[in-house]
Amino acid sequence: MENKGLCDQIAISDMSERRMITILGPTASGKTDLAVHLASYLKAEIISADSRQVYRGMDIGTGKDLGDYTVDGHVIPYHLIDICEPGTKYNLFRYQQDFLDCYENIRKRKVQPILCGGTGLYIEAVLKGYSLSPVPQNPELRMALADKSLEELTVILADLKTKNHSVMHNKTDIDSCQRAIRAIEIETYNLSNPVKERSCPPIDSLIIGVNIDREERRRKITSRLKSRLANGMVEEVDGLLKSGISAEDLIYYGLEYKYVTEFLIGNITYDE
């Protein structure tokens, strides 16, 4: 097994005071492969920290690759994948609650939990015990922001984060105007409704960062994108649109879903 040496090192490291193992890294770095083999080695269970893999039916574009969760014929238990319908606005607050339910259940069974994913904000919220509360929509604020450009919204968001001393930095906040407006809505709410106590305790974890040569990573990303397109990415998005999921919602999910949707609704060409 390619990761056996690292698995050996982790297994013999001092985990007596560690309640969890966290594996993180950029796209196409191999973190899922490491997590799966480590889980097999330790008889552990994986908790996903991916903001898009929570959605059912969004398989190719999110790179679920659920077949990879089988090692030597044994399926590694995984959690927080395929837990809600596309179009649902799954958020950080809900993830934190869902994570805690999974984590406590796994620990209660005296099994080692492994947190793995590429959504840094989800991982940070769990490890640091962010104090979160559900933020209601603010129709008046949304209306006031509706005509502003993404650049203008980015400036407003940066100012609010400064005022809030916010550490919740997430690049996807400024992927689109819709995301930026929601982020502004959250920061505006937090400015007026500060939470003084954490809603959950921080979790002590062994953190493993997976890295990869930049050129190799770029090659893998390009290869993976071509593979996804060849294996039905466009058809997957078309099916989601035909099922009633709005183009706006799919664009909200970013990355491949954004561009394939833009292609299907005629905003860009296939080559673009």
Q: Where do the language-model regions lie?
A:
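Phosphate/pyrophosphate-binding catalytic cores of soluble transferases and nucleic-acid-acting enzymes
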Residues: 1-272
